[in-house]
Amino acid sequence: MSQLTELAKKRLSRSMMFVPGNTPKMINSADIHGADSIMIDIEDSVPVTEKDTARLLTAEALKSRKFRGETVVRINHPTQTPYGYDDLDVIVPAKPDMIRLPKTEDVSEVEIVAKKIEEVEKANGWPEGTINIIVAIESVRGLYNVREICHGPRVVAIALGAEDYRADLRTGKHKPAVELLFARQTILHAAREAGIRVIDTVFSDVKDPQGFREEVEFIKALGY
């Protein structure tokens, strides 16, 4: 494993700002909150009719401006959707710091993304490990394969995607989030064993600062 990938495993990940890739105004202002990572999303937040536009806008933003935070692009899954391979073809040459692979269920899916990154790095003469991978666990199958996934090529971080995971469990959102406890602990243990970063799920209620604080204190107590 490259030195750059090893360094990326240790990078600070206190906060990640999600912005939709089809909204240039939000992409351009993503830095103002000082997040450690800027994640441009061309997956769930972008309608099917705007996938091509979001892909091109995201690539152009990565090429034309310097973000202060670490840059991450959440692509569409290459084997679960018809958009993922096109995402890789356009986004990887734009040189984000990381590709986020959503709905990861098997290490073979990570290998597909890693292979494309390797091809682009070599073609451009970039050092190995210039671009790395963050995986997202969003299903029961992914959770049960999490140890192998964490050891996948170029994987430097892992996150929990709670909404799809809840749907796979056939449950809903609760307070406290008892339905996420097993997943959070399992992902945390796998990440610690693999020596990679671990990132909790999104807190989406921007009107509940007290709830946000309680959630942060809880996951910190778990070991995040």
Regions found by a protein language model. Name each.
Residues 1-224:
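Expand to "…catalyze enediolate/carbanion chemistry for C-C bond making/breaking, isomerization
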